[in-house]
């Protein structure tokens, strides 16, 4: 870290980049809500050890990869159930919140924190066509806004909540989660 800083390279430490420890996966991985709490404990250690030298932190890199790993099987752990993807998504958002709480508790005056969310905004093929506009809106709600709405608005969109309820993919959402 010191050598990076000497070379005028700003370190940005990512706490989770698709590399969940094997033993945590054996305990259910991101389907286990406790992993979010343990992530917060891990974040506390990272901030204590590196907070005075690292100016930028990212809690999670591309949380959609977790959804894809649990719902589509394209990444680890290779599961293929949408309800698993929604639960993993919710729990990784909880982990982000735990990480941010640990960061705030560490009171790091010269550092910042965030999350890396893929934003592939869908635009209607025909902006004057109501059906195209509606499709683009739904696609956005189901992709990047499924992360940004909980983080910045403190809730999932009504559309996404209704869709998860209708499809039986609603994760366990407790008071205080958002």
Where would I find each of the regions flagged by the language model?
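Active-site region of glycoside hydrolase catalytic domains
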Residues: 2-178
């Amino acid at each position: 870290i010191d050598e990076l800083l000497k070379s005028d390279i700003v370190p940005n430490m990512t706490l989770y980049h698709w590399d969940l420890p094997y033993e945590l996966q054996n305990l259910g991985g991101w389907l286990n809500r406790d992993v979010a709490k343990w992530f917060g404990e891990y974040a506390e250690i990272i901030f204590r050890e590196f907070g005075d030298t690292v100016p930028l932190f990212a809690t999670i890199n591309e949380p959609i990869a977790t959804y894809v790993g649990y719902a589509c099987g394209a990444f680890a752990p290779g599961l293929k159930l949408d309800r698993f993807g929604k639960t993993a998504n919710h729990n990784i958002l909880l982990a982000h919140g735990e990480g941010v709480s640990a960061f705030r508790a560490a009171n790091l005056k010269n550092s910042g924190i965030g999350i890396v969310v893929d934003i592939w905004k869908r635009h209607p093929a025909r902006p004057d066509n109501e059906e195209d506009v509606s499709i683009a809106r739904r696609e956005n709600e189901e992709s990047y806004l499924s992360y940004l709405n909980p983080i910045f608005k403190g809730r999932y969109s009504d559309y996404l909540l209704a869709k998860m309820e209708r499809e039986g993919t609603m994760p366990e959402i407790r008071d205080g989660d958002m």
